[in-house]
Amino acid sequence: MNTKPVLVILGPTASGKTELAFRIARQTGGEIISADSRQIYRGMDIGTAKPPRWMLDEVKHHFIDKKEIGEPFSAGDFAEQAAEKIRELHQRGITPVVAGGSTLYLEGLLKGFAELPPADPEIRAQLTRELERHGAEALYRRLEALDPEQAKTLDPTKTQRLIRSLEIIEISGTTVTALQSKTPGPPTGINFTVIGLDLPRELLYERINQRTSAMIQAGLEAEARYLFDKFRDEWRSKNLNALATVGYRELFEHFEELHDLDTAVSLIAQHTRNYAKRQLTFFRNRLDVEWVKAPLDEAEIEALVEFFSTRQDDSVPHSPIAIAKKQNA
């Protein structure tokens, strides 16, 4: 059994995961497994910051452009299929590099999913009525009181997960956070080394603002307009969760004349910053991550390349960068 560590690079949006994973995969002859729940959809390119075509051509990426918008693909599907892909790459002697920031994709792959109670139609219907009557903020405040750690990881506007969290609490009599602590563990035969890219908040926010501007300049408005025209009915009926992605939903609201373009762009940057905060909260509270100061310098990148090119045992080092540097000294 191949127990060579599998490198996982995670971090908040705009932290540099794509570029670092590409460099390591290219220099190790590896392939990238994208842990991004939006890049998996075809047609959502600029707004999800997909790697440019030259990167995709130079290094094989998996789980990008795999599905049409609207095709079902759950975090459980990703965890199962990503584990299968890692085993396949190991059998072929290829180094897999997992990179992404989708919290549930990463949790499912790294820890497995806790056993949660099935949906209760009556409780869900009651919560839905409360949502319609009192709004999402009231339900979010309730979740904050009952399970503050879970609330910190949720976008208050994503009502599906909000209702599910409250439903689980109502059914089980305990919190989602407590239930999620009882996970089955990583896939059999796969050993992960997880590093998180830790940027100073000011730098991270600056990068988010710059990327938002770059997306607009690259044609995000036209991309969103095409999707809005194609999925207008689904957007209005809230039947496609993918369409609620930051960067698209603000422009869709602009197309509905709820605000002007400048406001939409400002909201994209603001909502992306909020999303980055929720990602960091989730990673720090729910996953075992070795955080490294980013951006990494050349010596640190080369140390990672060397470490994952040569290491064959099944130990998970506390600091792969530090150990690799020591070995190469």
UniProtKB/Swiss-Prot annotation:
Its cofactor is Mg(2+). Substrate binds at T13, A14, S15, G16, K17, T18. ATP binds at G11, P12, T13, A14, S15, G16, K17, T18. Keywords: ATP-binding, Magnesium, Nucleotide-binding, Transferase, tRNA processing. GO terms for molecular function: ATP binding; tRNA dimethylallyltransferase activity. The keyword Cell membrane does not apply. Its EC number is 2.5.1.75. It catalyses: adenosine(37) in tRNA + dimethylallyl diphosphate = N(6)-dimethylallyladenosine(37) in tRNA + diphosphate. InterPro entries: Dimethylallyltransferase (IPR039657), IPT (IPR018022), P-loop_NTPase (IPR027417). One of its GO terms (biological process) is tRNA modification. Catalyzes the transfer of a dimethylallyl group onto the adenine at position 37 in tRNAs that read codons beginning with uridine, leading to the formation of N6-(dimethylallyl)adenosine (i(6)A). Belongs to the IPP transferase family. Monomer. NCBIfam families: miaA. PANTHER family: TRNA DIMETHYLALLYLTRANSFERASE (PTHR11088:SF60). This is tRNA dimethylallyltransferase. It comes from Chlorobaculum tepidum (strain ATCC 49652 / DSM 12025 / NBRC 103806 / TLS).
